[in-house]
């Protein structure tokens, strides 16, 4: 569409506020529609009786349109695709303005592209997550997928699009280090998540590996070692999980920090994602350890 002139990709970054507003409205609309549909069709799940709480947390667990699980579809197909398109839009704007794309903006295109790829190619692992099998599809999840993730995790992209490259220029060795660290962190994140999810599927007898590109090495463990807890849960102690308790969280946060660091140190705004995500991961660790 961009090459044909039908749609300029720079419009996303140029009209960032308008796109964000539409996404917010869509988040509210889908939340209300999903809630009342569940109530009227008697498909509610674990209701408290308090409207505000139930609307926020959700009424339906896994609403569907035909064979499509809306919660699973919205978790990947909306937020990460939008975030990747915002990064591409920022790169296109720099190319139009300067005649080149800075290594910093190219870094964000690579980073968001890798994350989108990891989520899309590993969709068979998503049903194993807490978000899918326990959390309901309410305002908290819907609004965050429609507006929160794509329009807050992109602050470094917006910052670089609004400021000259001199504000966030690094030396060549620094770029090499940051790119290398991103790729290593993503490898650990992607492969450790795959190890955990496929281990669970191995125990359930449901493992079916998809060979979507790229499949990182060490993503599927053969005869993995694990501990059996008093509560009957099996804890993986093989692969990345033999070295630390939360390799996926550590690598995921490293990526988040790099997303901010690539925009330099003149503003704290690009670091919003890493600070927010640290709070989220701290809460998740507490929840996991309690379980």
Positions of the model-derived regions?
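Hydrophobic transmembrane alpha-helices
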Residues: 1-125, 132-197, 201-220, 227-291
């Amino acid at each position: 569409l961009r090459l044909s002139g039908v749609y300029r990709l720079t419009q996303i970054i140029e009209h960032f506020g308008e796109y964000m507003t539409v996404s917010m409205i869509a988040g509210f609309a889908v939340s209300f529609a999903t809630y009342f549909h569940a109530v009227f069709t008697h498909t509610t799940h674990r209701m408290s009786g308090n409207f505000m709480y139930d609307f926020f947390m959700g009424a339906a667990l896994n609403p569907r349109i035909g064979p499509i699980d809306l919660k699973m579809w919205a978790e990947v197909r909306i937020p990460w695709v939008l975030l990747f398109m915002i990064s591409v839009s920022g790169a296109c704007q720099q190319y139009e303005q300067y005649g080149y794309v800075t290594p910093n903006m190219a870094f964000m295109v690579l980073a968001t592209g890798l994350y989108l790829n990891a989520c899309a190619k590993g969709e068979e692992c998503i049903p194993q997550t807490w978000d899918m099998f326990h959390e309901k599809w309410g305002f908290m999840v819907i609004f965050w997928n429609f507006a929160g993730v794509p329009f807050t995790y992109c602050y470094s992209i917006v910052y670089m699009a609004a400021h000259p490259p001199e504000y966030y220029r690094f030396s060549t060795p620094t770029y090499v280090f940051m790119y290398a660290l991103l790729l290593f962190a993503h490898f650990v994140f992607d492969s450790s998540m795959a190890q955990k999810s496929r281990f669970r599927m191995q125990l359930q007898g449901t493992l079916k590996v998809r060979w979507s590109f790229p499949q990182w090495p060490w993503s599927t463990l053969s005869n993995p070692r694990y501990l059996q807890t008093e509560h009957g849960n099996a804890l993986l102690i093989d692969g990345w999980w033999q070295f630390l308790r939360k390799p996926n969280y550590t690598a995921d946060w490293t990526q988040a920090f790099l997303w901010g660091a690539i925009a330099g140190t003149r503003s704290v705004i690009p670091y919003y994602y890493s600070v927010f995500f640290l709070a989220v991961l701290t809460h998740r660790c507490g929840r996991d350890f309690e379980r």
